[in-house]
Amino acid sequence: MLFRCIKAEKKKLAHSMIFPACIVIPIIPAIMGTFNYLQNTAILTKQWYSLWTQITLFYSNFFYAPLIALYCSYLWRLEHRNHNWNVFLSTPVTIPCLYLGKLAVIFFVTLITQIWVGILYIIAGKLAGLPGICPPQILFWLLRGTFAAISIGALQLLLSMIIRSFSVPIGIALVGSIFGMLISSSGYGLMLAGMNSNRNTDSLAGDNLTFLVSTFIFFLLFYLIANQVLKKRDV
């Protein structure tokens, strides 16, 4: 049943603006970060690592979570129109599968976004005249940060499910990103730590298990809440 739900959710993305958004929007932080790097090469001397700190300074703090929120708001958009909630909750599929189907599609689109960010980073590095190739460690940081989409997506799906507005959950994600940046400065921002945002050394210092466990705990929390909300929702 879960695969049927995933297939149905993917059909909603056909001919939508989601994929153009996941291609165009990451270009903005890539340009901003590269420009910032080129203006400060006298103090940013770690080359590929320094470029990474500048691109992720903008991308992780201001674009990553709002992009996921955008994807989530779009997937709930049809349910919030007319009487589509009746159709959604009347389908012969379990509540967990309905929610997890959406989350799986969100993770898939986020993965595409992250791959594109990696490509933009490599292109930016070459345009900036950096020698050699991108350090493999940085690509690992990018992949590790992708797993944060599981918990972020679970929360944003919950918010977009409850809030009918398309833009409000995205605004909440932006505010949360800024708040998370402040928390990160105190050493507790595991999402940003996962992607190693604005760092040229591994901020987790190899403690990947803590990051993965915290991601799973937050996912489980938001999933259980969403599951209860859906069960109590009137058809």
Put a short name on every predicted segment.
Residues 25-68, 73, 100-163, 202-208, ...:
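Secretory targeting signals
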Residues 17-18, 82, 94-96, 100, ...:
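Membrane-helix interface segments
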Residues 75-107:
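Helix-loop-helix units of permease transmembrane domains in multi-pass membrane transporters
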Residues 78, 91, 122-126, 161, ...:
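Transmembrane helix-loop junction
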Residues 1-26:
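Aromatic- and glycine-rich beta-strand/loop motifs that create alpha-glucan
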Residues 21-26, 163-181:
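Pore- or pathway-lining transmembrane helices of multi-pass membrane proteins that form conduits
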Residues 32-52, 170-235:
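Terminal transmembrane helical anchor/hairpin motif
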Residues 9, 13, 89, 151-167, ...:
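Generic transmembrane alpha-helix motif of multi-pass integral membrane proteins
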